[in-house]
Amino acid sequence: MANQIDESKPISDLEIMRHSAAHIMAEAVLSMFPEAKLGIGPAIDTGFYYDFDLPRTLTPEDLPEIETRMNQLVKSNLPFRREEMSKDEARKLFANQPYKLELLNDITDETVSIYRQGNFCDLCRGPHVNYTSKVKAFKLLSIAGAYWRGDEKRPMLQRIYGAAFLDKASLAEYLNMLEEAAKRDHRKLGKELELFSLHQEIGGGLVNWLPNGAIVRHLIEEFWKKEHLKRGYDLVYTPHIAKVDLWKTSGHWGFYRENMYSPMDIDGEEYVLKPMNCVYHILMFKNRTRSYKELPIRMAELGTVYRYERSGVLHGLSRVRGFTQDDAHIFCLYDQLEKEVVKVLDLAKFMIDTFGFTKYKVMLSTRPEKYVGELDKWEYATDILAKALEANQIPYQVDPGEGVFYGPKIDIKFEDALGRAWQGPTIQVDFQLPERFDVSVVGEDGKDQPVAMVHRTVLGSMERFMSCLTEQYGGAFPAWLSPKQAMVIPIADRHTEFAEKLACELREEEVRVEVDSRSETMNQKIRQAQLAKIPYMLVVGDKEIETQSVAVRTRTGSQQVMPFAEFKSMLLAKIKTKSTEI
């Protein structure tokens, strides 16, 4: 069931066309700003971009003009021509383009290729379409800042993004998807629904969980804890900092230092914010002598870690600098490994299904170039993961070289509303850290026996999982996860007492409910509850008091009058079963 990712596959017609669209856009921008300095302009998954150093800041109002000029170039049916020349000739050609000159200096060959169309030429390996008229369906989307070569110490360029497809129908479909994705963007919904906030005064990538988001997170964490206790895990807690020497022993200081924060001096010793929880769990395991009969031992923690990310890649909750992992580490004998990984995959699938995720892909990531340990152990660990995937009948792709430095891993990646993949559950087999920390148990023969270790998360980080969950449901969480599950709306002041009585009964069942007794009209109250994506609105008036019923209106617009007792039973059943249906 494994498919190898083929990085050597030929360039598709679509990718070629998108690359050509980037060149056409560059020519259009140069016609508006002849003094522009050009960065790079590749094809990307859904289109293209090009980076420019311009005399003024672009605004969204500039995009239609650039697009108009692009369309004129397309209609001109200009040929794309490839030329080869020496690097010295190319330096003369790009004498006024400093970024191109820098790229030229990095090329080791003495001969380089350029592409021309119309009055434009670019340093480029190609290939391109034959004529500009082949670029038929494109749309400029946005402008963003991008540091030259991704280096925050280099100039900030202006990046123009565009979408491009082989036909207009495919482009229209993609633009419709973008429109829907914009509605579901967790950054937008996070603000509207008051789930979380980010503040530059605190720092980039550091999240405040607001009350509505905090209750959703709490519910996820409580469910996570109960499920882990049921499955034989022990809950633990660990500190947020540790001495640098600990990370030197683990190998993180050598292999992972660029993702760690700078050390802080405490009483003459160097400490650092933890990027991982694993080393703490290892020391807990070593807290006393253990027998092989105790294995497997499973330690689980909702542990907050800190990893450096460049400011340019921070993205709402999806890419942050401080986050809480649903982390666990399993210590077991070698012959217990496969069974334990099978169990972890079963738990991960159970979690994914419970939260209603349907779009995700599974990757088996193998040995990277920089690694520790013996090859035979790497092969054994990789084989264990593959067998566990096949035992669970989970289709997967092999992702060569994407394992961590101490072992191979299974990655389950959630797909967001834009089709982008975000890291979710991960399972890693590790023989190296137990060796580095001399982890062993007393075997049946009374001698020390080596221990294997499984690193795993079944949600990923709470922050990233919340971003995926928010976009999955467009902020309209299932009833069991909704910050407010019901809103009781009295039609007039005389109905407020009855509304409060119903709310009190629901609160006794731990339902999150409020009464909207404000002076606004009933329609305004219903509208505001719908905007807050509250699953159920219970309208009560004279009839409802007389019959002990409620007029139930769901956030999707369906309406039904039913006895209050019946509604309460229905809601409690949906909460208990964690139904994704309203």
Swiss-Prot record:
Q: Name one GO molecular function term.
A: ATP binding
Recorded hits in InterPro entries, A to Z, give: aa-tRNA-synt_IIb, aa-tRNA-synth_II, aa-tRNA-synth_II/BPL/LPL, Anticodon-bd, Anticodon-bd_dom_sf, Thr-tRNA-ligase_IIa, Thr/Ala-tRNA-synth_IIc_edit, ThrRS_anticodon
GO BP, one annotated term? threonyl-tRNA aminoacylation
UniProt catalytic activity: tRNA(Thr) + L-threonine + ATP = L-threonyl-tRNA(Thr) + AMP + diphosphate + H(+)
Q: What is its main location?
A: cytoplasm
Query: Which EC numbers characterise this protein's activity in its record?
Result: 6.1.1.3
What CDD domains does the record tag this protein with?
ThrRS_anticodon, ThrRS_core
Q: What cofactor does this one take?
A: Zn(2+)
Q: What does this protein do?
A: Catalyzes the attachment of threonine to tRNA(Thr) in a two-step reaction: L-threonine is first activated by ATP to form Thr-AMP and then transferred to the acceptor end of tRNA(Thr). Also edits incorrectly charged L-seryl-tRNA(Thr).
- This chain's protein is named Threonine--tRNA ligase
UniProt gene name = thrS
